[in-house]
Amino acid sequence: DVCPLVPIANISMEETAKYAHQLGKRVGEELGISGYFYENAATSNERKNLATVRSGEYEGLKEKLSKANWKPDFGPTQYNEQIVSSGVTAISARDFLIAYNVNLNSTSTRRANAIAFDIRENGRAKLVEGKKVLDKDGNPERIPGKLKAVKGIGWFIEEYGIAQISYNLTNITITSMHEAFYETDVAATKRGLRVTGSELVGLVPLQAMLDAADFYLKKQERSLGISENEKIKIAIKSLGLDDLKPFNPQERIIEYVMNADAEKKLIDFSVKDFAEETASESMAPGGGSIAAYVGTLGVSLGAMVANLSAHKSGWDSKWEYFSNWAEKGQ
């Protein structure tokens, strides 16, 4: 199995890789389990790609471990009873991976796969008259798909009675969630299908949701200077994340989950609670907090004017100018 360490906040990838190495050392010494480091924790370029590390699978471990270039990074280096029992593991430091499914108005796995092949980086095998075209080394040639850092396959989901395209977005700084959704919609339309929504498996970074909202707001030529809560609502509706079941941001956005048990801050108070706390016997909030709040209200009024202006009839050509000022207000 794999154990990736993913930096979320206040830590670099380099620091995360060091923790991955420490974890691997402990797994090897304390549990007696062998394994490899991959991606940003890899000890060689050959081991960066997880698919390469996994090649041969469990059945090929005995042969793999006999090769000098596949000596494990941690744990026993020889094939033994422990490896027979537990196999090996892979530990890494990597960027956030999003497991993301796009819903279709179809039950056809074949059509879903065709769209997946259009989009995923690995694309599809090159065919001539139904036969695979081979390169000079005898390997099948491939026609690359539209998006980088995307793995995908089509399948039928019995639970919902629809076909989906199941994606792994392996680097959302290269291909974002909304790009995958948008390009899938384009490819589906070309094939006579329609995208009805999408589904997240697991958690998603807040920034991915905000970026999705900004993408669709720009397409609508609407102001980007709106609140975080409003952007989350727009992202949910634009991507159809509530198509199959309710989408609760507090349970699905990783930053919200991490902060759920955090102590309540002044910024989280309602106006009434803030006023009552100010009037209490405690020394804080005091004059500084009150001045900051009054200043914030002034900025809010400015942002309101910018947002209203961005959507004003006859000022369509200036929406981006006003949107920029509204964003500064936020």
Residue ranges and their predicted role:
Residues 121, 190, 299, 303, ...:
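Short, well-ordered loop/turn and helix-capping segments at boundaries between secondary-structure elements
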Residues 2-273, 280-281:
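Long, contiguous binding/interaction regions
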Residues 4, 279-305:
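Conserved phosphate/anionic-ligand binding catalytic regions in large, soluble enzymes, centered on
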Residues 8, 283, 306-314:
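Short, flexible helix-adjacent loops and helix caps
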Residues 311-330:
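A structural-propensity feature for long, helix-poor, extended segments
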Residues 188, 219, 309-310, 315-316:
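Short, intrinsically disordered/low-complexity patches at protein termini
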